[in-house]
From Swiss-Prot:
Highest taxon listed in the record's lineage: Eukaryota
Pfam families: Fringe
Enzyme Commission code(s) on record: 2.4.1.222
GO molecular function: metal ion binding; O-fucosylpeptide 3-beta-N-acetylglucosaminyltransferase activity
Record protein name field: Beta-1,3-N-acetylglucosaminyltransferase manic fringe
Membrane topology classification: Single-pass type II membrane protein
Lineage, top ranks: Eukaryota, Metazoa, Chordata, Craniata, Vertebrata
Organism: Mus musculus (Mouse)
Length: 321
């Protein structure tokens, strides 16, 4: 009874804070009182219940240039199934998207450039919004990812609730090496694993709380500058080099930088994330026959969605089993 009461309190706080915070532009110096209040609420919770989709905060990073070409596809497909858990982080206002998403569209003060500081600025916005939410898991994806909610929940349920968890797919088959800037123009060689942001990754709350000194607000951009690497690398650096944690590699996350055609149709429902794009000069998409042609559905996301959810109104009847 007490667990459910605390869960209800957390849900109410989440709704109020998100409406008040996420509908406005993000400011790098997010109110410390709001963060501390969320942390105190988390500490009062006597024990977690079984993980549910409603416990997961899903952040989608995008930019103005892709509002039409990418976001409409996501909103029509997987986001429609978990809209309450999904927040879109962008760099420019969009009245049409605002009407469709309401407070789930977060317009940051970050630059639209594809630069390390701009990317790190958005990641900091995602991270701080998660802290305020009070939810149990933070999952980051890009705007060219398809998220399978059932597979995501199933994966996260496998991890012990009392351990720090950082799960995703490494983009390299070895740790990355970086030069960490130190005082007096000195550098220190560091090595660590990181989950590629293009495939998505997840971090549980107790680990996220430990990351705050390096990842909250402007600290994330500063930390990224220390190693002069992008936002996803910075997450791995904080967890492995600053906190002594470890990446839990998972083959269920996928980016457009791998050969997606190698996944069989029978494997697709088991994957947590999928992607599409151009790789080595060729269109790189999952291999999935119908129900839409490649001209109608070049990303194959609509066909995948109909495979997973054949009851979707716009799916052809032949998609049903």
């Amino acid at each position: 009874m007490h667990c459910r009461l605390f869960r209800g309190m957390a849900g109410a706080l989440f709704t109020l804070l998100c409406v008040g915070l996420l509908s406005l532009r993000y400011h790098s110096s997010l109110s410390q009182r709001m963060i501390q209040g969320a942390l105190r609420l988390n500490q009062r919770n006597p024990g977690p219940l079984e993980l549910q989709l409603g416990d997961i905060f899903i952040a989608v990073k995008t930019t103005w240039a892709f509002h039409r070409s990418r976001l409409d596809l996501l909103l029509d497909t997987w986001v429609s199934r978990i809209r309450q858990q999904t927040f879109i982080f962008t760099d420019s206002p969009d009245e049409r998207l605002q009407e469709r998403l309401g407070p789930h569209l977060v317009v940051t003060n970050c630059s639209a450039e594809h630069s390390h500081p701009a990317l790190s600025c958005k990641m900091a916005a995602e991270f701080d919004a998660f802290l305020v939410s009070g939810l149990r898991w933070f999952c980051h994806v890009d705007d060219d990812n398809y998220v399978n909610p059932k597979a995501l929940l199933q994966l996260l349920k496998t991890f012990p609730q009392d351990r720090d968890v950082y799960v995703g797919k490494p983009s390299l088959n070895r740790p990355i090496h970086a030069s960490e800037l130190q005082s007096k123009n000195r550098t220190k060689l560091v090595r660590f694993w990181f989950a590629t942001g293009g495939a998505g990754f997840c971090i549980n709350r107790q680990l996220a709380l430990k990351m705050v000194p390096w990842a909250s607000g402007s600290h994330f951009v500063d930390t990224s500058a220390l190693i002069r690497l992008p936002d996803d690398c910075t997450v791995g650096y904080i967890i492995e080099c600053k906190l002594g944690g470890r990446l839990q590699p998972s083959p269920l996350f996928h980016s457009h930088l791998e050969t997606l055609q190698l996944l069989g149709a029978a494997q697709l429902p088991e994957q947590v994330t999928l992607s599409y794009g151009v790789f080595e000069g060729k269109l790189n998409v999952i291999k999935l026959p119908g129900p839409f042609s490649h001209e109608e559905d070049p990303s194959r996301f609509r066909s995948l969605h109909c495979l997973l959810y054949p009851d979707t109104p716009w799916c052809p009847l032949l998609a049903a089993p």
